[in-house]
Amino acid sequence: MALLTVPISAESRYKMINDDLVNFINEVCDVLEIPVPNISDDFRVFENNTRMAMLEIEKGVPTLYLSDRMETEQDYYFAVAHELRHLWQCLTNEKYWLGNYKTVEEIGITAYNRQRLEIDANAFAALIMVLSFEMVPTFPSLDLETRHMIEVRARQIMPELDD
């Protein structure tokens, strides 16, 4: 089943960076014990229209870019939590998390999704969705093995979130 991606008007996009989203970003950063990155709605940085959020660190300054496209509001929040976990990865142990990183073009989508930094970011974002919205992401586009890897990692992360 294909998911509908709806373009959002400039007026609506402005409303997306609202108090709820800013509060969510602040709360996730607080959980991760990381500084809040700059937030930009300059969606022109996106190479394709399937991503909803993207983290970029330039000269040591992190910026979270928010796209003008979303599948659902929950998907949007998931993408934000996922990208904030990537910031945490860079700030806590960049060599460990990104040491063997490969792009999807280099290794294909399945191997890309199974990289430790992606498994970790997906697991963290899934837990945040459960805690924040009582929603359990099902990852329908991922194969069973990748979903299992995310589930195992989520169980490892859970005690960190109980503190």
Task: Describe the role of every protein-language-model region.
Residues 88-100, 130-140:
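Substrate-binding/catalytic groove segments of enzymes
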Residues 2-11:
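Acidic/histidine-rich, surface-exposed loop or edge segments in extracytoplasmic proteins
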Residues 111-114, 123-163:
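Long, well-structured alpha-helical subdomains associated
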Residues 24-27, 31, 83, 149, ...:
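Charge-rich, solvent-exposed alpha-helical interaction surfaces
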Residues 31, 38-63, 70-74:
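Catalytic zinc-binding patch centered on the HExxH motif and its immediate surroundings
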